[in-house]
């Protein structure tokens, strides 16, 4: 893979930062604020599991990536037009949510979730593709850090701030804030000029064939597909239970938002630059194993969460924050590997195809976690997460040569 890109300018960095923050604000709103609100209104774990399952629509972003690769760049650019379209769609969803009490209308709630997930998928796909054409290889580790820090900042906005607005001023104010944020992003996109980049040529049949042939290349292979599906699943399995478990331990929605959308992001913002330094100075292969191994004892500690809660009520939040820190250190490395294995001419398709697999594994794990927690209890569900983490660690070790190839061939 060639790497003849010039360094990104200030407008590129600004859009990558603000756009990534907005994207993860949507995630924070969906997975933290919305779930906490619904749990507070008496929704069961089985009902909440459907929210996670609908969220897996975002994994279909690879289909939107195919549309982006097939359509020639127009007057709005290769990715900018899609970003504008998605942001307009999201604005419509938040406008609808501001006008209707979705907590009392399950059908409308699910409709909003579907629309939110679909538009978020389009936005995330375009933003990831833009990152690939803007960032040269040497900046991708740092670009992964930017996205990870934006993820934490976005959760603070979409989770804690939205929950605070909801608890203090109601649903209209919370949805209105998200609408205002969307309109601000529209304004920035209108003034942004996307750099030129080559587009993939060929028919829809050729693009469909690429979805299969991508996994048959030496740098990927079907083993890479399995690894991407599994690598984030253990953490996602545990993370899906954070909101309902904190509620069951007696924490209010505002406290839950403070823990998950302020405590975790602030702690992660502090340690994330360390991951960027690691990415620039150490081989990805070593980092993957070292940072993944940090999760194992922390996942195991979750099986004792009830006992620790009896010792001190704030020990469970400390466990949750520590586990999230371990994943925060790993995430930039995963993002860098995804970009390494993406060709510039098919940036949106390659990166979105890979990240869609990661998301599909994460949302599937979250759906299963809530169902298992309802059926066998939180403690046994956390043991399942531990066993899953050990299995994934073994898969990483057996396929460690894949990390060597991406580093050697992307210089």
Per-region residue spans from a language model:
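Helix-loop boundary and gating motifs at the non-cytosolic
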Residues: 2-58, 222-227, 231-246
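Glycine-rich segments within core transmembrane alpha-helices of 12-TM secondary carriers
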Residues: 61, 141-166, 355-366
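C-terminal ends and interior cores of transmembrane alpha-helices
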Residues: 84-103, 294-311
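Helix-to-loop junctions at the C-terminal end of transmembrane segments
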Residues: 61-77, 270-284, 373-374
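Intracellular juxtamembrane helix-capping segments at the cytosolic ends
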Residues: 34, 121-135, 328-343
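A late C-terminal transmembrane helix in Major Facilitator Superfamily
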Residues: 345-376
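C-terminal transmembrane helical hairpin of 12-TM major facilitator-type secondary transporters
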Residues: 286-334
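Juxtamembrane intracellular "pre-TM" segments in multi-pass secondary transporters
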Residues: 2-9, 194-225
């Amino acid at each position: 893979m060639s790497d003849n890109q010039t360094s990104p300018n200030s407008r590129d960095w600004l859009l990558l930062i603000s756009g990534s923050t907005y994207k993860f604000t949507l995630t924070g709103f969906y997975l933290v604020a919305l779930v906490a609100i619904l749990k507070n209104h008496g929704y069961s774990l089985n009902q909440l599991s459907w929210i996670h399952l609908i969220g897996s629509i975002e994994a279909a972003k690879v289909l939107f990536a195919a549309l982006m690769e097939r359509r020639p760049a127009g007057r709005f650019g290769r990715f900018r037009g899609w970003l504008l379209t998605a942001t307009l769609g999201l604005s419509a969803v938040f406008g609808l949510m501001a006008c209707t009490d979705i907590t009392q209308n399950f059908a409308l709630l699910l409709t909003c979730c579907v629309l939110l997930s679909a538009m978020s998928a389009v936005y995330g796909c375009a933003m990831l593709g833009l990152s690939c054409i803007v960032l040269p290889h040497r900046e991708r580790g740092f670009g992964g850090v930017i996205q990870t820090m934006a993820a934490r900042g976005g959760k603070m906005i979409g989770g804690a701030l939205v929950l605070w607005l909801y608890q203090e001023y109601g649903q209209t104010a919370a949805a209105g804030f998200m609408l205002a944020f969307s309109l601000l992003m529209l304004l920035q996109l209108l003034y942004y000029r996307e750099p030129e980049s080559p587009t993939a040529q060929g028919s829809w049949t050729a693009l469909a064939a690429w979805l299969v042939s991508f996994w048959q290349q030496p740098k990927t292979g079907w083993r890479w597909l399995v690894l991407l599906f599994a690598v984030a699943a253990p953490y996602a399995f545990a993370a899906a239970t954070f909101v309902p478990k904190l509620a069951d331990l007696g924490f209010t929605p505002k406290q839950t938002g403070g823990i998950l959308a302020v405590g975790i992001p602030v702690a992660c913002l502090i340690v994330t630059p360390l991951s960027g330094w690691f990415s620039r100075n150490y081989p990805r292969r070593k980092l993957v194993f070292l940072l993944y191994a940090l999760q194992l004892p922390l996942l195991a500690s979750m099986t004792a969460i009830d006992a620790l809660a009896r010792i001190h009520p704030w020990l469970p939040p400390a466990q949750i924050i520590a586990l999230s820190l371990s994943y925060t250190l790993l995430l930039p490395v995963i993002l860098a590997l995804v970009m390494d294995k993406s060709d510039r001419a098919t940036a949106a398709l390659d990166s979105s195809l890979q990240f869609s697999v990661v998301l599909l594994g994460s949302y599937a794990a979250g759906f299963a976690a809530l169902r298992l927690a309802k059926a066998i209890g939180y403690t046994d569900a956390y043991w399942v997460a531990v066993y899953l983490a050990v299995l994934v660690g073994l898969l990483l070790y057996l396929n460690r040569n894949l990390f060597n190839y991406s580093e050697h061939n992307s210089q």
